[in-house]
């Protein structure tokens, strides 16, 4: 198997196959769940709005892939600084049956100089999650600077994040190699690689993109670190490209998350 094919297979099994669109329906989410089951393996998770969790859970069970996890989003995509609302949404997501919650860090508050609200929001959302995985979206494309990306990553980890995630996919700049390098280095420098994972989201569209992101993780944190409890790709259009690279199916037109 070529290096690119090996990376494509690895990336497929690390995908949070995502649909977070305003026009999502039960039918679209069911189709997404069907796509999570492929001839070469299943994606790690599907990522959907909370109201679609029951439909996804039923479909994943019926198609014989109950191990595909269900991730959802809260405080999304705006990243407002109302802790009470973020916690209420997170509790509701847990009640719906989410296996994982991706919450948006109040990044605009941090840009304005308020670090405390972000720490407290993540801490309280993690308390609401209990054992359920909490991924914190820091919105690197809006934070922009290395100092702010580093600070948001550190605050999230100190507050209890299980993963730090680059982006919502709803702003002009999403996952970049530069942001990934900063965030992975924070995980290394804080010595939390055993307990904290990383998720680039938005903008990872090809097997070559995924290969480059994985090579960076291997370089910074070691070749066996990026398993499906420490590394995810948040993507939709990536799947068709990975399957095409692996000789499965036709490559769809590129677009989306």
From Swiss-Prot:
Keywords: Cytoplasm, Lyase, Schiff base
GO molecular-function terms, A-Z: deoxyribose-phosphate aldolase activity
SUPFAM superfamilies: Aldolase (SSF51569)
Biological pathway: Carbohydrate degradation; 2-deoxy-D-ribose 1-phosphate degradation; D-glyceraldehyde 3-phosphate and acetaldehyde from 2-deoxy-alpha-D-ribose 1-phosphate: step 2/2
Enzyme active site: 102 (proton donor/acceptor), 165 (schiff-base intermediate with acetaldehyde), 199 (proton donor/acceptor)
Subcellular location: Cytoplasm
Top-level EC class as recorded in UniProt: lyase
Reactions accelerated catalytically: 2-deoxy-D-ribose 5-phosphate = D-glyceraldehyde 3-phosphate + acetaldehyde
Gene Ontology biological process terms in this record: 2-deoxyribose 1-phosphate catabolic process; carbohydrate catabolic process; deoxyribonucleotide catabolic process
Enzyme Commission number(s) of this protein: 4.1.2.4
GO cellular component: cytoplasm
Main location: cytoplasm
InterPro entries, A to Z: Aldolase_TIM (IPR013785), DeoC (IPR011343), DeoC/FbaB/LacD_aldolase (IPR002915), DeoC_typeII (IPR023649)
PANTHER family, per the entry: DEOXYRIBOSE-PHOSPHATE ALDOLASE
Role noted for this protein: Catalyzes a reversible aldol reaction between acetaldehyde and D-glyceraldehyde 3-phosphate to generate 2-deoxy-D-ribose 5-phosphate.
Family recorded in the similarity comment: Belongs to the DeoC/FbaB aldolase family. DeoC type 2 subfamily.
Name recorded for this polypeptide: Deoxyribose-phosphate aldolase
């Amino acid at each position: 198997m070529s290096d690119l094919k090996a990376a494509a297979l690895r990336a497929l099994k690390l995908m949070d196959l995502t649909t977070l669109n305003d026009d999502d329906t039960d039918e679209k989410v069911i189709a997404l769940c069907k796509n999570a089951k492929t001839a070469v393996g299943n994606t790690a998770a599907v990522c959907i709005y909370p109201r679609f969790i029951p439909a996804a859970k039923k479909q994943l069970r019926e198609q014989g892939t109950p191990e595909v996890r269900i991730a959802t989003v809260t405080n999304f995509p705006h990243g407002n600084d109302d802790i009470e609302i973020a916690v209420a949404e997170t509790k509701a997501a847990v009640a719906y049956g989410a296996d994982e919650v991706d919450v948006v860090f109040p990044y605009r508050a941090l840009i304005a100089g308020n670090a405390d609200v972000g720490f407290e929001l993540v801490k309280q959302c993690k308390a609401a999650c209990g054992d359920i995985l909490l991924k914190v979206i820091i919105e690197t494309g809006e934070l922009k600077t290395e100092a702010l990306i580093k600070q948001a990553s550190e605050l999230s980890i100190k507050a209890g994040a299980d993963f730090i995630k680059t982006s919502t996919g709803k702003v002009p700049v999403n996952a970049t190699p530069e942001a990934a390098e900063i965030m992975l280095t924070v995980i290394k420098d804080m010595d939390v690689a055993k307990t904290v994972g990383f998720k680039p989201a938005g903008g990872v569209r090809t097997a070559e993109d995924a290969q480059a992101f994985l090579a960076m993780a291997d370089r910074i944190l070691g070749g066996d670190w990026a398993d499906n409890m420490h590394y995810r790709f948040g993507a939709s259009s990536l799947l068709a490209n990975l399957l095409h690279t692996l000789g499965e199916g036709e490559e769809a037109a590129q677009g989306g998350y």
